[in-house]
From Swiss-Prot:
One of its GO terms (molecular function) is L-lactate dehydrogenase activity. The keyword Lipid metabolism does not apply. The lineage of its organism: Bacteria, Pseudomonadati, Pseudomonadota, Gammaproteobacteria, Enterobacterales. FMN binds at residues 106, 127, 155, 251, 306-330. Its EC number is 1.1.-.-. This is L-lactate dehydrogenase. It comes from Enterobacter sp. (strain 638). GO terms for cellular component: plasma membrane.
Length: 395
């Protein structure tokens, strides 16, 4: 299959992966309205084309949390990444490291902190949930710090799991799920050999290290279901600060008031995110939520954004809407599933090229020059409360 755009990786991944894994990452909550709007709203953001601006010295480099990034992109935390390619977290981290951008390790990764961190030169980021087992949280923070992780990404939009109906149909959960997953695995030989046979162990490395015993997929589902904590509050940030003194980013912000609270409670950054449409269906897309949040806290805190970003043009759109940088999730996982580290490296090359084209044709020589002035306001009235966007078809 010819890979000429990031979207090609999705089609390739669907052929390679067992359905339970493809639909786990591809799907969203409930009827998946927010999942679709994440992509559609962002695709409808119209950029303002400018010409004859002498763009010969264009630069994508930026700084974030005292780190220099080759472009304003980081790889988002993705659970079970190591089930999509052999030791997937290690491969994805290597691709990000070579590109000069951060990789974020998920709490529920297959490869533990201690396996991934020594393989890269750049300090990785670590993502943490608020869980009932505070002993695990403290253990994870201490291990992340000991491994040299530079930034903590604290996910706050999962006090309870979202209702992901696709999982019951695909075999991730539901009746006879284990048997269905087994049959899917043996009928997808490329994945079965690369990951099923050679990608072991398949446990959740960070959790296994804490519990002192292997953990499989069933353990993953059960452990998370029993440990999400609906009592989460802003005071939990104060507790985390007892064990973490580096940059802390709050992931899962969709409302300006929550963004202001993040500033008040001393966070260093926020991620404008609806968890890729996987938690509460019907909430605003990140593209629609971002401008009002930027108006509220831009300059007071670093603003990152995710959900719906599929290519370099989308990165430029998010920055024009108010983000300082973005996180890539599904896009890089499709590439990882298709060609491993090389796939992620190629995806990042594609994104860089697409960003350069977009910046060249909008007259922005640097990341700091991408702003709301880069948008055609008549078509880009994204903030909640303004006129709806013109209808279009998502790319």
């Amino acid at each position: 299959m010819i890979i000429s755009a990031a979207s090609d990786y999705r089609a390739a991944a669907q052929r390679i992966l067992p359905p339970f894994l493809f639909h786990y990452i591809d799907g969203g909550a409930y009827s998946e309205h927010t999942l679709r709007r994440n992509v559609e709203d962002l695709s409808e953001v119209a950029l303002r084309q400018r010409v004859l601006k002498n763009m010969s010295d264009l630069s994508l480099e930026t700084k974030l949390f005292n780190e220099t990034l080759s472009m304003p992109v980081a790889l988002a935390p993705v659970g079970l990444c190591g089930m999509y390619a052999r030791r997937g977290e290690v491969q994805a981290a290597a691709a990000a490291d070579a590109r000069g951008i951060p990789f974020t390790l998920s709490t529920v990764s297959v490869c533990p902190i201690e396996e991934v961190a020594p393989t890269i030169k750049r300090p990785m980021w670590f993502q943490l949930y608020v869980l009932r087992d505070r002993g695990f949280m403290r253990n994870a923070l201490e291990r992340a710090k000991a491994a040299g992780c530079s930034t903590l990404v604290f996910t706050v939009d999962m006090p309870t799991p979202g209702a992901r109906y696709r999982d019951a149909h695909s075999g991730m959960s539901g009746a006879n799920a284990a048997m269905r997953r087994y049959w899917q695995a043996v009928t997808h030989p490329q994945w079965a050999w690369d990951v099923g046979v050679n990608g072991r162990p398949h446990d959740l490395g960070n959790i296994s290290a804490y519990l002192g015993k292997p953990t499989g997929l069933e353990d993953y589902i059960g452990w998370l279901a029993n440990n999400f904590d609906p009592s989460i509050s802003w005071k939990d940030l104060e507790w985390i600060r007892e064990f973490w003194d580096g940059p802390m980013v709050i992931k899962g912000i969709l409302d300006p008031e929550d963004a202001r609270d993040a500033v008040r409670f001393g966070a260093d950054g926020i991620v404008v995110s609806n968890h890729g449409g996987r938690q509460l269906d019907g909430v605003l897309s990140s593209a629609r939520a971002l401008p009002a949040i930027a108006d509220a806290v831009k300059g007071d805190i670093a603003i990152l954004a995710d959900s719906g970003i599929r290519n370099g043009l989308d990165v430029v759109r998010m920055i024009a809407l108010g983000a300082d940088s973005v996180l890539l999730g599904r896009a890089y996982l499709y590439a990882l599933a298709t060609h491993g580290q090389a796939g992620v490296a190629n995806l990042l090359n594609l994104i860089e090229k697409e960003m350069k084209v977009a910046m060249t044709l909008t007259g922005a020589k640097t990341i700091s020059e991408i702003s709301k002035d880069s948008l055609v306001q008549e078509l880009s009235r994204i903030p909640s409360g303004l006129a709806p966007l013109a209808q279009g078809t998502a790319a």
